[in-house]
C-alpha cells in the first residue's frame, strides 16, 4: 500500500514540487558552468548531485507509486470497469521508464565527458518529469472527485 500522501492531491503535489525545485536548481547550476578547468570538475559534481537526487528521491518515488498507488488504481479499474484508468496507469509507468532511461543517458554522457549531451539529458529529464507530474496530479484529482481514490 502507498502512503496516504500519494492518494491526496495537495500532499502529492507538494512532494512533486519539492523534487521539481531541487531538480531545477541542479539543472540551472549545471547550465552556468563552462566546460573548462575547475568548472568542468564542478560540473561533474553538480551532475553527481543531480543523479543522486534522481535515484534517491525521484525514481524512488516512482517505484513507490508503481508498487502502491498505481496498483491500487488498477484494482479500482478491475472493480469498476474503468478501462481508461488502465491506459492512464500504463502511460504513467511508461513515463517512469523514460525517466529511468534519461537518467542512465545522463550518467553515460558524464562518464565519457560529453557536456552538451549531459545538459540536454538533464533538461529532457526535467521536461518529461514536468509532463508526468501534471498528468498524474490530474488523475489523482479525477479519482478523488469520483470517490475512487
Features from the language model and the residues they span:
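Small-residue-biased structural context
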Residues: 1-149
Amino acid at each position: 500500500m502507498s502512503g496516504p500522501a500519494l492518494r491526496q492531491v495537495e500532499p502529492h503535489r507538494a512532494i512533486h514540487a519539492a523534487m521539481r525545485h531541487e531538480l531545477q536548481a541542479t539543472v540551472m547550476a549545471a547550465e552556468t558552468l563552462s566546460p573548462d578547468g575547475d568548472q568542468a570538475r564542478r560540473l561533474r559534481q553538480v551532475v553527481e548531485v543531480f543523479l543522486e537526487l534522481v535515484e534517491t528521491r525521484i525514481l524512488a518515488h516512482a517505484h513507490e507509486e508503481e508498487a502502491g498507488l498505481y496498483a491500487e488504481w488498477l484494482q479500482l479499474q478491475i472493480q469498476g470497469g474503468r478501462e481508461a484508468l488502465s491506459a492512464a496507469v500504463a502511460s504513467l509507468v511508461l513515463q517512469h521508464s523514460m525517466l529511468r532511461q534519461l537518467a542512465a543517458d545522463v550518467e553515460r554522457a558524464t562518464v565519457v565527458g560529453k557536456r552538451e549531451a549531459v545538459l540536454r539529458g538533464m533538461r529532457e529529464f526535467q521536461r518529461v518529469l514536468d509532463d508526468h507530474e501534471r498528468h498524474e496530479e490530474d488523475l489523482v484529482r479525477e479519482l478523488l472527485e469520483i470517490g475512487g481514490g
